Amino acid sequence: MAEKRHGAWFGFGFCGFGQALGSGNSHHSVYSPEPLHASDDICQVSAGWSYTALVTRGGRVELSGSVSGAADGCRDVWASEELLVLLRNKGGSSTEVQAWVPGSALQGEPLWVQNLVSGAKGQGEDEPSRESRMGTLPLLPCARAYVTPEPPFCQPLAPELRVRQLELGAEHVLLLCAAGQVFSWGAGRHGQLGHGTLEAELEPRLLEALQGLRMAKVAAGGWHSVCLSETGDIYIWGWNESGQLALPTRSGTENKAEREEATELNEDGLKEELAVADAGAPAHFIAIQPFPALLDLPLGSDAVMASCGSRHTAVVTRTGELYTWGWGKYGQLGHKDSTSLDRPCCVEYFVERQLEVRAVTCGPWNTYVYAMERDKS
């Protein structure tokens, strides 16, 4: 009989509100992965900017950071600054989606509730004993609607889309359908929609640049997007201000404090950088990539999972390595410093300890990873 391998969750990056991240000894940032100072049976993590929601295998959700609180019967969770969304068992086979104000600490009444059809399940919800899982929220289990942080909180989706995965960026939406096609809509002024322009889209629009390629995963950052093909290729597009696309960036060579504090460019600044990049002389940096670009990892590694923070990107390879790049001011890249990177770099912490990374999920300014001991056989 094979020896049971042990796994654990790790965290690194911003923890200025006391959210569960590493050992809990840091007042502001964690620059290298540390085991979570939390329950041993955590199976899911969802992080907002100022707080984190942890779900145990027994279905208990626990909040840490700027808000606290706990509740039982949780099957899935999605955390944002505006809204905390839970998928909860309500007795028997009854299930409901609850949208809470994060500061309510899960006390009183939720802002919004929707009862689900009996037996409706999201991907991974029928395996509560798994050591780690990725929920489907903000996509509802029926796959015909999704939750948004603003009223009316629930937006319908056309049934013909046959949605497999849906991710929300700061101003845009990515959708992966059952046929492996990717759709996007929302604001586009940072190129995050991938249609080759900076125009907004009000309805789901097919990414024509990826037609003929079957995609397996999508991930939405603040203003950038990633998708992974079924064969492990990475396609990436959108805003590259901090190198989150792994393309040459001005902020990688300039040391300007105001750029580290910025959260987005205004339209004038955006046009100015585009003009420089499009000038006759060869551009030394790329501010915006408005359509999908193929990205190769070192050693030609295949990618099986991706997650994006506000301005950083994390990818797990088929062989269990973690690569991160982009904005690193709070240690969210896990490379023991606050350096931002415009190229994928392996997080050596897990390699040095013979740990195989199985899952990654990014908060806006931090990163959570599930890893387990490598098979020694």
Curated annotation (Swiss-Prot):
Repeat positions for RCC1: 6-57, 179-230, 232-289, 319-372
UniProt entry tagged with the keyword Repeat: yes
Membrane-crossing residue ranges in chain numbering: none
Keyword Disulfide bond (UniProt): no
InterPro entries for the chain: RCC1/BLIP-II (IPR009091), RCC1_domain-containing (IPR052830), Reg_chr_condens (IPR000408)
Residues where (3R)-3-hydroxyarginine is found: R144
Role according to the record: Plays a role in transcriptional repression of satellite repeats, possibly by regulating H3K36 methylation levels in centromeric regions together with KDM8. Possibly together with KDM8, is involved in proper mitotic spindle organization and chromosome segregation. Plays a role in regulating alpha-tubulin deacetylation and cytoskeletal microtubule stability, thereby promoting cell migration and TGF-beta-induced epithelial to mesenchymal transition (EMT), potentially through the inhibition of KDM8.
Protein name as it appears in the record: RCC1 domain-containing protein 1
Organism, scientific name: Mus musculus
